[in-house]
Amino acid sequence: MYKNFVWFVQDLYGTRDFIPLHAPRFIGNEKKYLIETIESTFVSSVGEFVDRFELSVAEYTGAKYAIATVNGTSALHIALILAGVQKDHEVITQSLTFVATCNAIRYCGGTPVFVDVDKATLGLSAKSLEDFLQEHAEIRNDGLCWNNGSNKIISACLPMH
């Protein structure tokens, strides 16, 4: 199965060579900005560049505010809190995902519920989600989505790339 998956991904990217997860790409002022950041002594979660980044994201998205987070897990955690995920709630996500997805759900006290991925995209399958919701979920009189099998609230759906 492992070899089949690797071949599938290699075919998708049109190569049998190593496919890096993250390849750095420097195309402009990165070195200059890194030196400025180091010299400012603000190299972590605060400083001029963080402030500028947050303002740029807010402006670009049309949001009133934007915040930079330390990593993707903390960003997902905040998003789930804002979505109303609480202890004993369920969150639908895909079966092929990074551990951060489930960690963020558990940090809120929730439980991940897995649906299958789309073979063409490796993202959450809309068909699998539709099938799951039709078979297992209902909107009750309280206006919330409930899993009939577990009798728990489904408070979010978290598709990942």
Task: Identify the residue ranges that each predicted region occupies.
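A short beta-strand submotif of the Rossmann-like class I SAM-dependent methyltransferase core
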Residues: 68, 93, 156-160
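Active-site phosphate-binding strand-loop segment of PLP-dependent enzymes
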Residues: 120-161
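Conserved coil-to-alpha-helix start sites within the AMP-binding
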Residues: 97-101
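Phosphate-binding glycine-rich loop
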Residues: 46-90, 104-106, 114-116, 138-150
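N-terminal "arm"/small-domain region of PLP-dependent enzymes with the aminotransferase-like
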Residues: 1-43
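Short beta->alpha hinge that forms the Motif I/post-I loop of the SAM-binding pocket
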Residues: 96, 117
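Structured binding elements
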Residues: 109
